[in-house]
């Protein structure tokens, strides 16, 4: 991912304020609501029958936190996203058979959730930087598929 020094410092400063549990759960929940076909990977999470059920589901929240913690690790290794996500790419490709397009969708949902939580602080410049990173992470997670 090619970022300017200003973009990197902006990403880091905002990320330090992110509540990984809250934003991770909301991002994954929104993915499952807006793109319901993604629920097939999470049938073992229990009730996903309504938007309210998804957003309140503790397993969705917990897994969202795990996903966002991994994303945070990626932010520490922007120069080696493929290496950072190699094991997760293999897991999602070989064992879970997740459509790699879902990584892009989740990245876009994450940007929306960050914008919702941070309002005016989430400037167009920060959005640009986060869009670059989520695209890079999605590409790294899809790497094993190629």
Swiss-Prot record:
GO molecular function, one term: hemoglobin alpha binding
SUPFAM superfamilies: Globin-like (SSF46458)
UniProt-listed GO biological process terms: hydrogen peroxide catabolic process
Binding site for heme b: 63, 92
PROSITE patterns, A to Z: GLOBIN
Pfam families: Globin
N-acetylvaline: modified positions: 1
Keywords: Acetylation, Heme, Iron, Metal-binding, Oxygen transport, Phosphoprotein, S-nitrosylation, Transport
Its biological purpose: Involved in oxygen transport from the lung to the various peripheral tissues.
Protein name per UniProt: Hemoglobin subunit beta-1/2
Organism encoding this protein: Physeter macrocephalus (Sperm whale)
Gene name of this polypeptide: HBB
